[in-house]
Amino acid sequence: MPVRRGVAVGVLALAVLIFSSPGAFAQGQTGSIAGVVRDTSGAVLPGVTVEASSPALIEKVRTVVTDGQGRYNIVDLRPGTYSVAFTLTGFSTVKREGIELTSGFTANVNTDLRVGTIEETVTVTGESPIVDTQSTSKLATASREVMDVLPTDRNFVSFAALTSSVLVTGVRQNVGGSIPETGMNLVVHGSRASDSLVTVEGMPIINGGGTGGLMYGNYLNNGLAQEITFQTDSHNAEFERATVYSNFIPKEGSNTFRGSVFGRWAGESWQSDNLSDEQKAQGLSTGNRIDRIWDINPNVGGPIVRDRLWVYGGFRHWGTYNTVANSFKDADFSDIFYHPTTEQNLNPVWHESVVARFTVQANQKNKFNLYTDWQYTYFGNCFVPTYLTAISACPEYKNIPQYILQGSWSSPVTNKLLLEAGGTITPQDFHGYRRPGVSETQFAMNDTTAPAGMPQNWGASTGYGYNRSDQTNYRASASYVTGSHSIKTGFMLMHAWRYNTQEPNNSASLSVRGTQPFSLTQYATPIQFHETLRYNMGIFAQDQWRYNRFTFNYGVRLDFLNARVDPQDIVAGPFTPARHFDAVENVPNWKDVDPRFGVVWDLFGDGKTALKGSVGRYVVGAAYEIARPANPVQSSVNTVTRTWAPPAGVIYNGDYNPYNDCDLFNPAANTKRPGQIQCGAIQNPAFGQVTARTTNYDPAVINGWHVRPNNWEGQVSIQREIVPRVSAYAAYTRRWFGNLTATRNQNVTNADYTHYCIPIPVDSRLPNGGGYQQCGLYDVNRVITPNNLIFSSADIGGIDDVYDGFDFDVNARLARNVILSGGVTLGRERVNNCILKDDLSLAFGTDPRTDDYCNITPPFQPQVKGQVAYPLPRWDVSLSATFQSLSGPQLSASYPMSNAIAGPSLGRPYTGVPPNINIVPNGTMYGDRIYQTDFRISKALRTGGTVIRPTFSVYNLFNANPVQTYNTTYGAAWLSPTVILQARFWDIGVQVDF
């Protein structure tokens, strides 16, 4: 639907911000308490002993002394509630209680001491600081309390989604856990979707293939979480990328046995129906619905050796079975063709985790942690199943039991020097198997002419194969902390490798039109790939310097990344001889210097108003997959198409096995059944051969200093404590990308193409109602073997890619644990690659080469988030709700071309396969906005030291039905809904804390 720019949406956004609103979200593994100590005359006091104590500290107390400016800084404090005592001979002792500390937050605690004796103690219970006047970073924290009270599925992405500036991509809107926990991307302020990073205690747990997003393989055991933090902006020199860092901080055991048991269940009969008559009329006969959702998560911890060795461990089994919209079970997998029943297909996904964390306090100065998580995962359908692919054509994906093994050490050598180190190993095996009922001899079938609402793919899958990746990473740092300076230096090092295969049945797949054979694809099996990330290393040094009311955060980071393609030996296959491929080194070999700078001004000196500014250079994430384009196996001709069709006017009467119809080992045209069927010559004679790479990198973009894709991020913000426990935040963020590349086919020039136009049908659904000529289209005059070169777009003038955005947040943590918070983000990413459109040797996709397709300026669209939790103390009942209002999906119109459509202007048939052309410029049409409100009520039942908390939750409270995905193929069914928001459903749960 065309974009509507109205004031109404903005007014609604502000209303939600004020009256409903994400919060309790305030990275790092630990926090800090810092401040200045003065006497009652205002003079600073050096030499004051400052002690921070909390049950969260295994050693119970952490001690520092104020410096010559009266400043102190206590670092490496685990999340929890702290008391801070200030003592100096000749002065009364002051004890400040009730300081709530979250990871990555610096609580500013200033104190005045009056003359007296140490024995005199003045206890102050004030409001906990909520404005960080020292760090420029924007942090959000999902504490244990927040995770337990809000109506969510306990997936860390669900908590990230409640942060106003964060956008979840890669999946549809998740209603109460109805979207299976699979690979998900978190985006903030125009960051790359694949850059988001998931860590446990600051160390990545992604598989070796992911750069952060699409984190297949490891799924977090929520019961072990003390809190989860999300860092979104103004990252210091410790961080490689400017993205969302999701950091999982596990619980630690203590001298007291404690734990919890959580359970949750939702069934198919607990869901309403939100499919409208209009959506049914548009062809959506059924929606996605839940079949069952469950989560079982007991955990417990305590001492093994009191005051020395502790453990905290747990088990979790959770999953989702959903029906797939418009997708119905096949009556017989073994039949050549798809025969739907009236029973909807299910998408079963489940995970299992057994995790334990061991903590050793070897002595007062040395603490060790060992974290291990053994997991098993099952995906019983396609990752994102739709009716277009029958379930038989989806592999069963299984993770062979795999694990995370992580160790860490910390040592506060003195009250000024802190040493830390750690390492993580994450082997992952993730394979695609044939599902029961699909035989090894069955072919993968495709029919692009299938009627609307019917699958285009059935039979077997072409996605079978083996995937193994190993990722290891290490970190070490040293921090030197005085009252005025906090200096930190260290490094992070990552290695990764992958081996994966492609194993389609019969080394062939078939295409039909109805029941008539059309073409087939042969595969050069076995197909396998080996790549290695030799190292991704960052070395950093930074300082946080407090001077008067200013805090300067400055640092520099050196990034080094090197990947290679390993030597590969592939045995002979049905169509190919044995092959050997030499190693390919330094693809890429990048080196970067990345400066970071930020400043915080405590505007009035009272710790309640902070004006902040920051700017930094960040590299774009990469892993071994960066080497894939340089892999000679990738550039080999691994698939080839040939016609497989009966002569004109002949009805096919074979068994749909092309091996019986033709000699597929003969590359020339041939048949075994003259007059009945004919196989054409293979379209590429180089099929299965070791060939020169058709895509190469300009050495200038893969080797050297400062050639890695990067982005600069700048931000200015202000945070103000309005009243105690209530703060407001506003920010402007700008991100601009650098070292963007372009691809040139060096074997073609403009003279090798013919320009043509196509008539756009008159259609009120199209921009301006259609009925015009779309020009700027080109078809190559002859088949030309590509010789692609990837080079810096700056060589031809550059591609512009810039994000601008505004954030407005309110956070309130009121008395009696009332949470009321929310935020609005307005942003857009502008891209101009018009430098590519006039040179036809430059890759541009199949979009028209006109200004409205290359200069993309979408509108600002508000993203609104809110949450509230309100305990009713008289009945020990808690009410909570969350709200999200998100922009609808961007729409496109992929218009299938034919010689009949393009021929009159082109003057000849297409040289190759007719393309699909997008006839709606990007950023001009969007679907319906998505509104989602979730609600929970819980009741605490207390008996002795045990609290039993049953819950009742309702998701999509108002049963909204916005369309989440549309049919994007232009035609009569264009814009018909394929998936709508999950209908309202409810679940029951219980949590027992002991």
Question: How should these model regions be labeled?
Answer:
Residues F156, V166-T169, P567-D594, G598-A794, ...:
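Solvent-exposed loop/turn elements at secondary-structure boundaries
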Residues P2-S143:
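Periplasm-facing N-terminal accessory domains of Gram-negative outer-membrane beta-barrel systems
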Residues G126, V261-G267, G313-H317, L370-W374, ...:
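Transmembrane beta-barrel strands of outer-membrane/channel proteins
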Residues D67, F91-E252, Q271, E278-S285, ...:
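Periplasmic N-terminal accessory/gating domains of Gram-negative outer-membrane beta-barrel systems
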Residues L561, Y729-S892:
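Gram-negative outer-membrane beta-barrel transporters
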Residues G621, R725, N739, Q746, ...:
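C-terminal beta-signal and adjacent terminal beta-strands/loops
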Residues R258, N288-Y378, I400-G423, P595:
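Transmembrane beta-barrel wall of Gram-negative outer-membrane proteins
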